Amino acid sequence: MAFYSYNSFLAIFWTRLPGHSVHPPCSHFPPLAFFHLPDSHLRTAYMKNCGSRKYSYPGLTGNNKVHPLRTRLPQKLHTTCWLQNHPGKPQPEQIPEEPKATDPQPTKDDQTEVAEGKWSLRQKIIDEVKYYYNGFSLLWIDTKVAARIVWRLLHGQVLTRRERRRLLRTCADVFRLVPFVVFIIVPFMEFLIPVFLKLFPDMLPSTFESESKKEEKQKKMMGAKLEIAKFLQETMTEMAKRNRAKLDDDSSDSSQLSSYVKQVQTGHKPSTKEIVRFSKLFEDQLALEHLRRPQLVALCKLLELQAFGTNNLLRFQLLMTLRSIKADDEVIAKEGVKALSVSELQAACRARGMRSLGLTEEQLRQQLTEWLDLHLKENVPPSLLLLSRTFYLIDVKPKPIELPPSIETPKTNLGIPSSPPPESKEDITDPAPQLNGTKILQAKSQETSQNSKANSKGA
């Protein structure tokens, strides 16, 4: 009885343990488990088996024999290892996973654009502080330089054109700061300075203006000047028609004037002699006293002046500006055009209603020298000179960059028969079709000759 209870307890104990299943020694075999089941007499136990190997428990050796009966129970093994591919059995098809669509990574340019677009309030404040600090520092430097120029002027020294213009610019910048004194004197009014600057940005000195803003302003003024130039060209053609009608049709002056106007309209660049010759016909009509309001307004815009007020005020404004231009021309002629820098050349051409953008340095010097020759040497009226510059304002274009001619290396003929050079590159054709055509013509000529011989023999 004790033996029976011992064997039954031992069998139940081994079947209830977590190690009741044994992993196969090779991954090619299916996961099977063999359990020990007691026989009818409860004297022997069946052993676990995997394949052909047998495992016996300690204590079950001796005279106890093992029956060949085994109970085979399939059971899935919980393991983290993959089964190896068996060479004899077909493997289940594995569906490849589709690659997941990954979002494109933002480039550095996109990151910089996002960073620039999302400026914080602190960065904006820092940029504004730097902007005003640089403007005031440049204004302080210009003020010190202007003080030295004034000291030299008081001691009787003669100033150059560049020094005089710098002194005038600095004085204008200092006087622009006078209205801001009111904001400082009145308490708590300094908080309105940003609003005032937003409404009137031109009240700041020239040292606060950046290069990009200057270029944008010049481009806008250039577009307005082109429109004004077209209007002034129409006025010139109308005046030419009137003068041609007044003159006799048979006279040489009328025919030459008509041809001159046609050449100018087609883009011909008139010479100084032609301008001087035909300027005598327009002296009375192009005087400031005889110009109408649309023409006066157009000339004021051409010289970048304010076009507000009565006709007499516009004439007086134009007269004073033309006098200052003549004095400046005399100084430039005395110092020489070559002494001017590129920025000074552009400013001088812009003040005289000529093109200043899109030209080379040589073209700027050339048109300025032509202006000086006509204004100082030939004594052309300034109003006519301004109207004549409108044709240059549209027609003048920058010169293309000339490339140096390519150096061709001499070619040597290595035993190849030289062929006659073609007349032009466009006349080069393939000789194969021509040869085929000649062969066909030769064959046809032979056939016709044979037919003619046969006919003659038959006759």
Swiss-Prot record:
Residues 88-114, 403-459 are annotated as: Disordered. This is LETM1 domain-containing protein LETM2, mitochondrial. The lineage of its organism: Eukaryota, Metazoa, Chordata, Craniata, Vertebrata. It comes from Rattus norvegicus. PROSITE patterns: LETM1_RBD. Testis and sperm. GO terms for biological process: mitochondrial calcium ion transmembrane transport; mitochondrion organization. Its main location: mitochondrion. Residues 220-440 form the Letm1 RBD domain. GO terms for molecular function: ribosome binding; transmembrane transporter activity. Residues 1-25 form a transit peptide. Coiled coil: none annotated. Pfam families: LETM1_RBD, LETM2_N. It is a single-pass membrane protein. Residues 435-459 have a biased composition (Polar residues). GO terms for cellular component: mitochondrial inner membrane; mitochondrion. Keywords: Membrane, Mitochondrion, Mitochondrion inner membrane, Transit peptide, Transmembrane, Transmembrane helix. Residues 26-176 are mitochondrial intermembrane.
